[in-house]
Amino acid sequence: MPGVDRERRTIPVPLPEGLPAGPRALLVLEEPASAPAAVAALDPVDGTLRLRVSEPAGGRVSVLVLVPVVDATALWLPGSDRDQSGLPPSWADDLAFSPFAGAPLGSLIGRNDRPVVTFGARAQGGRLRMRAGMVEETAELLVAFTADLSAGGLEVVLDLARDDFGAAVGRVRDAVGLRRPAVAAENHRPVLCTWYSFHQALDQDRLLAQARTAASMGFGTVIIDDGWQTSDNDRGYGSCGDWRVEPSKIADGAALVSELAGLGLRTLFWVGTPFLGYRSAAYAERGLPTLYDEPAMEAAVLDPRSRRVRGHLVERLTALLRDTGAAGLKIDFLERFGVDDPAASPEDCGGESVVRAALALLDDLHASASAVRPEPMIEFREPYWSPETLRRTTMMRVADCPLSPVRNRVGIVDLRLATAGVAVHSDPIMWAAADTPERVAQHLHSSLFGVPQVSIALDGQSPEQSATLRTWMRFWTEHRDVLLHGRLRVVGIASDYAAVEAARDDVVITAQYAPVISDAPAHASTWIVVNAHEQEILLRSAAPRPARYSIVDCTGTTVDEGEQVLDGLTAFAVPAGGVLRLTFRER
């Protein structure tokens, strides 16, 4: 079989009746002396195909699934850094997944953005590898999942329904554990982040001045990013590990948090959790066990298997919340814990793996923090979204992508589709000082379907830039229930989502990120279309739909209004960064 070592033993897995013609599944044995137990069955609730593999004796096993490729156009794999535009070969490199390195989830996309097959998997041990690509000899999609069964079983989930893309992804997402209980409302409030606007050069007076402006714009949270814990501005991580507020940057952490709270703003502090900086007191005095050094970062990575390490971090971070009154933490760099276990273990190790110990650290921290701050707000970011980490966070942010609206958009939509219950946040939005209001709007459009984080010097913007930010903050706040909790529909998956639509009750909001034709919703009373490109807006209606319309530019200024019957194709001259609002009259 193409893509399979001919020395490996392969065993066909019988599939249940009632499936579309064509799919087949096999086990590829790498290490087990005996064949693992494999059961395939259709789930009676969601109709997905579940393949469960177990082997008490352990060993590495691969589950291979082959599906005929008909009308395939692209392979969707969630992640802001993924290329969604093509079809990789079956011999492409494996992708490695762990609790701190994403989740194996994907969909083969056919014409009109319809799924051919949607797939995912979960290994009880948390680690597995996935390979997905086209078999050129047979015109099939090969999806292979490999896991070590000594850590527990492996379950593969397939959805063969060629219906709605978002619905298919949702069924597989839920089956592999990527849904958590809905988080509290404060996690969905817009965020002013200090990173791109200050970097480490924090200034308390300037921060407070900008916070006052942010509060007037509708922001609800301030993230005090890297820099609060160090007296220098050198961008390294040599000061990490003590996690005490540096008085030269913030004279009184509790007073600052209290003043921000008086403005209606919650405060989160950034922490580079794994790092033990070479210049920290903890590095010099405590002799904490480490996994490895990162000289370029001026730090070592702590070994979470050590009870002393976990105790140190829990004590320091809980004290930070208790002493300042902060609402939570932005926990960064957790992917540093996603490593294979070193040969040597610290003396106070309980026998768990590095990954399991890191998860235990997060649990200990949550329990301790909750005692001083009920329901703490916790931010994680790509790539550490997984079934294991999702329930340990309340906010999931797109990976760093400064000045990249496309990556922000793709990351937000991917996380919205691939997870449920958590608040999905943009990477902090920034723009150049000379950017036009239309360009500023383009950056803000990128975060429409997630919670916007902004990191820009609010006191350094032109009147037009400020007006654009205020307009879009007002728009997002007014429509956040639809944007965040409406049913998502995407167009142009292989084109980084040419259009995205959210619908809730009788309101539909469509953002066109490229010149496309958007179809009028059949039952909505209000249709809002955002022009996130440079051309006119084209709409299509299968039947005459009389409507009242208004058009505003990116600063919120009305440029046109009137009445129009949508019938067939209709063009509207909406300025770049502007909004078309249609209110349909009863027919």
State where each predicted segment sits.
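Active-site-proximal substrate-binding groove within the catalytic cores of carbohydrate-active enzymes
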Residues: L361-G577, T583-R585
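Catalytic domains of carbohydrate-active enzymes, especially glycoside hydrolases
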Residues: R206-S231, D323, A327
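Aromatic- and acidic-residue-enriched carbohydrate-binding clefts of CAZyme catalytic domains
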Residues: W228-G253, S280-P304, E335-L359, L365
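Active-site and adjacent substrate-binding regions of carbohydrate-active enzymes
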Residues: H199, M217, D226, L260, ...
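Acidic-and-aromatic substrate-binding clefts and catalytic sites of carbohydrate-active enzymes
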Residues: H199-Q204, V245-I250, P274-G277, W385-E388, ...
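N-terminal accessory beta-strand-rich subdomains and adjacent acidic, glycine-rich linkers
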Residues: M1-L178, H523-T526, L538-I551, T555-G556, ...
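Active-site-adjacent "subsite" loops/lids of carbohydrate-active enzymes
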Residues: R189, Y196-Q200, R266-D323, D414-L415
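Glycine-rich, aromatic-flanked loop segments that form ligand/cofactor-binding clefts
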Residues: F165-R179, T221-D226, S248-E298, E375-F380, ...
